[in-house]
Amino acid sequence: DILVNTNRILKQRIEPRRFMTCVLLRWNNADKKMYYTGGGHEHILVYHARERTCEAKQTGGIALGMVPDITKLVKEEQIGFEPGDFVVLYSDGSTEAKNMQGEMFGLTRLKSSVEQHALGGSPESVFTSVSKDFTQFVGEQVQEDDITLIVTQRPQ
């Protein structure tokens, strides 16, 4: 309902051909599970501490503001989110950022960076280390898009 109502209001208030992507995460303390609903946003990265792997989950859905009603396009999915696991959210400016040679940072590099730094780390240390990898990759190249990175962890 949140994305459906947000889309309805946004569609009425923004200029044609404008839109917004998003992903909505919801933690259910009763069943100890994380749920997400996509609004055409980037993948969600989930680092599974037990397996020491990082998984990219497509968020699905459609960007908000593109069509008047997204009721039939909104679907809530579940994320496996065990104690010690991380969820990483990011904007497309993070993966599409280019270095001086024009090469994009990309999803594969972002996943690898999370995998490398998550083991035994905290959300703060993972954020700092991934940000450092990103900064070293892009160097002095000016970026034209926003670069957003959010890291959260389910406590042990």
Predicted regions and their residues:
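Conserved subregion of the PPM/PP2C metallophosphatase catalytic domain
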Residues: D1-Q156
